[in-house]
Amino acid sequence: MAITPEKEKALAATMAQIDRKFGKGSIMKMGEASSRLAIEAIPTGSIALDIALGIGGVPRGRVVEIFGPESSGKTTLAQHIIAEAQKMGGVCAFIDAEHAFDPVYAARCGVNIDDLLVSQPDTGEQALEICEMLVRSNAIDVIVIDSVAALVPRAEIEGEMGDSMPGMQARLMSQALRKLSGAISKSRTVVIFINQLRMKIGVMFGSPETTTGGQALKFYASVRLDIRRVETLKQGQEAIGSRVRVKVIKNKVAPPFRQAEFDILANEGISREGNIIDIGTELGIIRKSGAWFYLGEDRLGQGRENVREFLKNNPALTDEIERLIKAQALTNPTVIAPSVDVGDDDAIFEE
């Protein structure tokens, strides 16, 4: 049914009044905001994870949570997202609540340390206030908070050791996210919370694992990534890295429950070349015959490690293979990022 002229006039007057009171753009027709509907993304540094996320990376203007066990690659993944944002000309900040930031390793992951903003706050309130100020500046592309578990409320720091303060951190996170969510959306900043796992006591059925900081972050996060180490990579008897699996537990911008696997090497972070070999082989772009790998009729090398070194020394060829993978995989991500089954009673997935 077409809107009547009287209704059209009343609606226009009301919208004009709202704009005058709350600012231009406070209300608009979706057709007028079509340019804002497209979701921009920042790559993660792993092409497999970019494809699993469905939009080519983590979404701008959203909250992202990365959680998993210790030494699973949470901070490494966050640092690669920072590196990718910097390559796009972005400004990034790292709020180091754990006071454990390693600039040498971050540089190996591709982070431009000279341009990275780093803060090591004393309390959880200070960390979240700094985050809010950076978001409202509209000048930051990525903010990483490492980690939620280290956001200790001021009252707990000023109190005596052993004082019981139940729920204080959860209340702090809930209040902060209520204030931050709108500002994050308007600023197009990606705010990444790194989180740790804890065990629930007395759980008889389902997973006893849960994340710290209460329930608020689970609701406000548009993307939640569960990262786990599945294998230790060795060269002879020496451990040189880890094979990790990332499950997209929640995704508000694309279909969720997909997963990706990639290598994290001790001296360079996420192995881009290893990722390209794995996915290129799955898609048939790279052909494997015995121990040899081929691109079309051209021989790349014998053995995965030799091919990885060859691609590392030939960045133009690596870029071309990556372009072919993205053109094929992003149109059909389920080919290499299959959906995974998540239990309804798993504590991590509760919302």
Swiss-Prot record:
Disulfide bonds: none annotated. PROSITE patterns: RECA_1, RECA_2, RECA_3. GO terms for cellular component: cytoplasm. ATP binds at residues 68-75. GO terms for molecular function: ATP binding; ATP hydrolysis activity; ATP-dependent DNA damage sensor activity; damaged DNA binding; single-stranded DNA binding. InterPro entries: AAA+_ATPase, DNA_recomb/repair_RecA, DNA_recomb/repair_RecA_CS, P-loop_NTPase, RecA-like_C, RecA-like_N, RecA_ATP-bd, RecA_C_sf. It is found in: Cytoplasm. The keyword RNA-binding does not apply. Keywords: ATP-binding, Cytoplasm, DNA damage, DNA recombination, DNA repair, DNA-binding, Nucleotide-binding, SOS response. One of its GO terms (biological process) is DNA recombination. Can catalyze the hydrolysis of ATP in the presence of single-stranded DNA, the ATP-dependent uptake of single-stranded DNA by duplex DNA, and the ATP-dependent hybridization of homologous single-stranded DNAs. It interacts with LexA causing its activation and leading to its autocatalytic cleavage. Belongs to the RecA family. NCBIfam families: tigrfam_recA. PANTHER family: MITOCHONDRIAL DNA REPAIR PROTEIN RECA HOMOLOG-RELATED, RECA. This is Protein RecA. It comes from Chloroflexus aurantiacus (strain ATCC 29366 / DSM 635 / J-10-fl). The gene is recA.
